[in-house]
Amino acid sequence: KKVVHENLKKSFPDLSQKEYLSLTKNFYKHLADILLEGLKGYSMSEYSLKKRFVYKNPEILDSHYNRGEHIMLMPAHYGNWEWAVLSLPLPLKHQIIGVYKPLRAALIEGFVGKRRSRFGLILNPISKTREAMNNPPKTPTAYIMMSDQHPSSRKKAQWVKFLGRDTACLHGADHYARKFDYPVYYMHIERVRRGFYEVVFSPLELNAAATSPSSIT
């Protein structure tokens, strides 16, 4: 709770105490919803998931698939990201590979991995990112890389201004997109109402090889 208050005050210094308290209350309510929805997602049917998690413009990626191009998708831990990675293979033509950090508890990792991949998602541990990117499959693939997690190495991190503060970001998506000239798209997840979301894909960079380091991040 102390961390939440400190972050709000640093990010929004002009808010009143009443506004801070309101934001804090809404944050915990939203967090509880996300956690419960995430658990529900492990048993949710394909029909229910499609009804609750709607992709508005998946066809924007079809031209890349038709040309046999791999692409990179950069969502964030915003909205229900668990439903995002779970449902992504359903509307897209691309094969989906998700780069992620495995859980430490092997039993839980096995269960979560199995449930996350039941609609076609291929999970790739972050420790094997280089191997996966240097040996791409023949099938046009969309790589999901969450870039808003805390990097394990601050030396390799890319630094950006976020909510007025210097913030360390993972460099992998930026690095590999430029190295292989992969088109990069942002997945914007919008909460329509409780338990219902919409996703819109928007291009971040379609000529990644021509960009400078950290520009995509």
Go through the PLM ranges and name each one:
Residues 1-75, 109-114, 120:
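Membrane-anchoring hydrophobic helices of lipid-metabolizing enzymes
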Residues 14, 18-25, 63-67, 91, ...:
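Non-catalytic C-terminal accessory region of glycerolipid acyltransferases
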Residues 29, 41-52, 82, 94, ...:
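Short, surface-exposed, charged/polar-biased interaction segments
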Residues 33-35, 50-53, 57, 90-91, ...:
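Alpha-helix boundary/capping detector
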Residues 67-128, 152-161, 165-167:
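Catalytic core of membrane glycerolipid acyltransferases/transacylases, capturing the structured
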